[in-house]
Structures are given as structure tokens and as C-alpha cells.
């Protein structure tokens, strides 16, 4: 599987590298699980609704979500900070 980050998601990911290594470690663990198991596993994966067809989210923390979509051999990461479209 190949990871493809939206520009804002990549900025979020880089932000975590300087702000909270523990959260960054959790994001990396969730990404590994997505690559291995798709839409099952930790972080309570759930599909997004209301116009976000095909996108899923997992809980990183109580405040932050990892939003992604699995397309063939790619995992497209849309966000990894805050809730959904914030």
C-alpha cells in the first residue's frame, strides 16, 4: 500500500512531528493497521457521512481524527488533526 497525503493532511502530520511525538506514534500505528486491515482495527473506524462517500475516520485522541480513503493500492489521507473539516 502507498500513502498519499492531501496537502493539509501532510501539514498536520509534520505539525505532530514537532508538537507531540506520542500522537505521531499513534497516527503511524493507525496507518499501519489501515494498510494491513483496511477498515477494521483500532481507533473505532467508521465511515464518514454527508457527502464524504468512501471516506472513513479513526480516533487518534478524543479531539483528533484520522480521515482516510482506501482506493485500490493507495491510502489517501485527508486529515490527521482536529475533526473532519475543521
Where does each model-flagged region fall?
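Enriched for short, Lys/Arg-rich terminal
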Residues: 2, 8-25, 29, 42, ...
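Short glycine- and Lys/Arg-enriched binding-loop motifs that mark or flank ligand-binding interfaces
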Residues: 37, 47-50
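Short beta-strand micro-motifs in enzyme catalytic cores
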Residues: 54-56
Amino acid at each position: 500500500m502507498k500513502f498519499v497525503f492531501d496537502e493539509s493532511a501532510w501539514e498536520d502530520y509534520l505539525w505532530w512531528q514537532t508538537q507531540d511525538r506520542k500522537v505521531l506514534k499513534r497516527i503511524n500505528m493507525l496507518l499501519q493497521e489501515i494498510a494491513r486491515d483496511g477498515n477494521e482495527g483500532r481507533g473505532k473506524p467508521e465511515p464518514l457521512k454527508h457527502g464524504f462517500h468512501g471516506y472513513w475516520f479513526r480516533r487518534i485522541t478524543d479531539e483528533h481524527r484520522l480521515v482516510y480513503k482506501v482506493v485500490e493500492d493507495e491510502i489517501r489521507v485527508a486529515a490527521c488533526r482536529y475533526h473532519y473539516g475543521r
